[in-house]
Every structure is written in structure tokens, then in C-alpha cells.
């Protein structure tokens, strides 16, 4: 699906693969589980692709070497870099690479695998021991959403809000997802989310319920970044990136408090405006 996503991105942009000179990836594709050491490797799948020294390349991880070996039409790539973490990090690495002149046409791809179909069914979660500082963080079995759930609980107390107020937002998010033909919901579960569904959902980490969490899927997304000069002649109307920014504050404890999150978010927003040379009055919409 990684190779397919990349090829579709180039086709959608009307770009000749030979013109691509940059590649940014996230080498990590796991959603919590890794290939068990005692489980036989799927050699039939592995051997159907050009291989690297790491047999699980293309199965439970990615490398630029594996991608280039299996996408022979990418003949002009001379810049590769990893953007580790969320898709947003890989995207900003690609944007900065274009801005710094390290490439003029750059593919960026992020893939996720979840072979078990559930989160955290392998790796450390399958172990009988919790080593090192993980014992402090994970001994009580908190799910991945608990940090955000704690912050949301603080938000509700601070501003007099409730979990139910999120229902219209979540209903609209599902509605938007159903209008995205490439997405999971449109392809596999074309069903609306109702207010009653949302309110009746079981808690995962109160006040975060089932529908406040994402769903484990196998997916790959690819985007193409290029210079403004080249973008004007491509098939699709381009989106121009004015700036990107982040904030790297250190929380006082294991999970950032709401006050810390609000402070860092505000700092990021100010950096975005300053670097882009605009103010809030220039925005026609907000996406947060």
C-alpha cells in the first residue's frame, strides 16, 4: 500500500516519477505491536519484493532503500530523510527540505500497519514484565488516550463543559469522513454516527469514550511537495505552505497538564503567525 499511495500521489499531481528528487518517510509503521521473534517470517510476501538486509522491510517497517528498490521509476532521487513520528512531522520535514533547496520535488509517505487488528496486542504489552521507567507510566494499564482524557477532564472543570458537548463535533467528523472516498469509513463502514451512539459508547479512559479514539487500520498516505514555480503547472490546484512551527516544552510530570498544553499551543500559534507574516484577521477558516 505504500508503493500504491506514492504512485497515486504522483499520478494525481501529474508528475513524472523521474522528476522526483526527494523522498521523506517515517521508517516506523507499528501501532504498538512488532513482529514476534518466534513467529515465522512471511517469506512468500518478502520474496515477492526486492529485499534489503532487513527482511521485515516493507512488512512492519520502511526504509528509503526498500522503497527505491521497489519503485524503479524513481530514478532521480538524491535526497532522502526520515521524519519520525506522526504524519505531521514527515510533512514538515518535506516542506523544509523544499524550502531549503535540498529537493525540488519531494514525495513524503507515512504508513501504519496493524496485523492483529487491535492496538497494543504485542510488543511490551504482551510481556509479563514491565522494565525500567515503563513501570511508572504503564503499570496500571492506562490506554494511549488517557493523557488527552485527563486534559479534557481538566478542560471540562475549568470551563464548565461536558463530554456530551463533543457529540456534534464527532458526528460531523464522521460525516466528513464519509465524504472522503479514499478513507476507511467511506470504503468499509458507510454508517453515520448519531448523538445517541456517541453518548452510549463505553468509556476507554473517562471522559474519553470509544468514539473519541481512533480505529486500528492498515493505511498509507503519500503527498507531493514541490516549489511554487513548479506547482503552478501541475494537474491539481496547489496548497502553499506559509510556515510550520512547534513548541517543545517539558511537562513537570508524566503527562502534560491542561495549563501546560494551552501554554505550548498558544506559543505554537504565535510562531505560526509570525513566520507566515499574517494575523488572525487574515484567516478565512480555522482547522484545529
Show where each model-derived region lies:
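Condensing-enzyme catalytic core mediating Claisen C-C bond formation in acyl metabolism
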Residues: 1, 8, 134, 167-171, ...
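Beta-strand segments within the central parallel beta-sheet cores of soluble alpha/beta enzyme folds
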Residues: 17-27, 77-82, 106-111, 164-172, ...
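Active-site-proximal alpha-helical scaffold in enzymes
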Residues: 81-112, 145-182, 223-229
Amino acid at each position: 500500500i505504500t508503493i500504491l499511495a506514492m504512485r497515486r500521489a504522483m499520478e494525481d499531481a501529474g508528475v513524472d516519477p523521474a522528476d522526483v528528487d526527494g523522498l521523506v518517510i517515517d521508517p516506523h509503521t507499528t501501532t504498538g505491536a512488532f513482529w514476534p521473534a518466534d513467529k515465522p517470517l512471511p517469506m512468500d510476501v518478502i520474496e515477492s519484493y526486492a529485499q534489503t538486509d532487513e527482511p521485515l522491510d516493507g512488512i512492519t517497517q520502511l526504509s528509503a532503500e526498500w522503497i527505491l528498490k521497489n519503485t524503479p521509476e524513481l530514478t532521480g532521487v538524491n535526497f532522502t530523510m526520515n521524519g519520525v513520528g506522526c504524519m505531521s512531522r514527515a510533512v514538515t520535514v518535506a516542506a523544509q527540505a523544499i524550502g531549503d533547496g535540498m529537493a525540488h520535488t519531494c514525495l513524503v509517505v507515512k504508513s501504519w500497519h496493524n496485523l492483529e487488528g487491535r492496538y497494543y496486542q504485542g510488543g511490551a504489552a504482551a510481556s509479563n514484565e514491565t522494565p525500567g521507567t515503563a513501570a511508572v507510566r504503564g503499570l496500571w494499564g492506562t490506554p494511549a488516550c488517557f493523557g488527552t482524557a485527563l486534559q479534557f477532564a481538566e478542560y471540562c472543570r475549568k470551563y464548565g463543559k461536558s463530554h456530551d458537548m463533543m457529540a456534534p463535533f464527532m458526528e460531523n467528523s464522521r460525516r466528513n469522513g464519509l465524504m472522503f472516498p479514499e478513507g476507511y469509513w467511506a470504503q468499509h463502514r458507510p454508517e453515520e454516527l448519531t448523538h445517541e451512539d456517541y453518548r452510549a459508547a463505553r468509556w476507554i479512559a473517562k471522559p474519553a469514550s470509544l468514539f473519541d479514539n481512533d480505529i486500528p487500520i492498515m493505511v498509507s498516505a503519500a503527498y507531493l511537495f514541490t516549489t511554487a514555480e513548479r506547482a503552478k503547472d501541475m494537474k491539481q490546484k496547489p496548497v502553499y505552505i506559509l510556515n510550520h512551527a512547534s513548541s517543545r516544552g517539558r511537562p513537570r510530570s508524566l503527562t502534560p497538564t491542561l495549563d501546560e498544553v494551552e501554554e505550548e499551543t498558544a506559543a505554537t500559534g504565535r510562531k505560526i503567525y509570525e513566520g507566515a507574516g499574517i494575523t488572525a484577521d487574515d484567516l478565512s477558516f480555522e482547522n484545529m
